[in-house]
Amino acid sequence: TVKHILSKTNDCELTGVQHGDSQPNAVDLRVKKIFEINKKSPFIISEEGKTHRGSTEVQPDEEGWFNLERGTYEIIMENVVSVGEGYAGFVITRSTLNRNGLFITSGLYDSGYHGVMAGCLHVRVGPAKIKKGTRVGQFLLFEAETLSMYDGSYGIGKQHDNKYGEISGS
């Protein structure tokens, strides 16, 4: 069952929600930062650990526009989410981006996750210009049987998320 995260009937919270962000079944997410993923460094993963490729922050121009060429980027939203027990969530792309050759992929937000909303922005047909603060994704929350709470390497206070700097709502 899909639930609305802004409903008072769940133990979940989403910060940074602005007027107009609440949609009938989801909440719009606004872009805060974009990092270009390093294409030359290998990504290494095993059951023993992982080594990320690394990335470089894309600076918006003086008017707040991110100028993006075709490629894959790590995208950071203005929002921080806390997913309560019995729930999970994921991010989908807003349809306007999808119809223009851009899409966002994101992992599952497990019960117990508290942290930054992030994912990969794939610019399949470039170039693209996205203004900082623009609504680019939507967060969907749903009921999920919880066998244990999230204890991974992402989230507020975790090493990976330190590169994002000060995050409001933490």
Predicted regions and their residues:
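DUTPase catalytic domain/fold
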Residues: T1-S170
